[in-house]
From Swiss-Prot:
The lineage of its organism: Eukaryota, Metazoa, Cnidaria, Anthozoa, Hexacorallia. Keywords: Disulfide bond, Ion channel impairing toxin, Nematocyst, Neurotoxin, Secreted, Toxin, Voltage-gated sodium channel impairing toxin. Its main location: secreted. GO terms for cellular component: extracellular region; nematocyst. This is Delta-stichotoxin-Hcr1c. It is found in: Secreted; Nematocyst. Binds to site 3 of voltage-gated sodium channels and inhibits the inactivation process. GO terms for molecular function: sodium channel regulator activity; toxin activity.
Length: 48
């Protein structure tokens, strides 16, 4: 699904970043967002 980064989240490289939920490594209770357009742009957001 679509995902938008939280500015205050960890690992924010490009925020707010719109992309997809990636099963990467974020802290428990967070989702990892990965950009559609940039493979190196990623961040974590609090699970809704």
């Amino acid at each position: 699904g679509n995902c938008k980064c939280d500015d205050e989240g960890p690992n924010v490289r490009t925020a707010p970043l719109t992309g997809y939920v990636d099963l990467g490594y974020c802290n428990e209770g967070w989702d990892k967002c990965a950009s559609y357009y940039s493979p190196i742009a990623e961040c974590c957001r609090k699970k809704k």
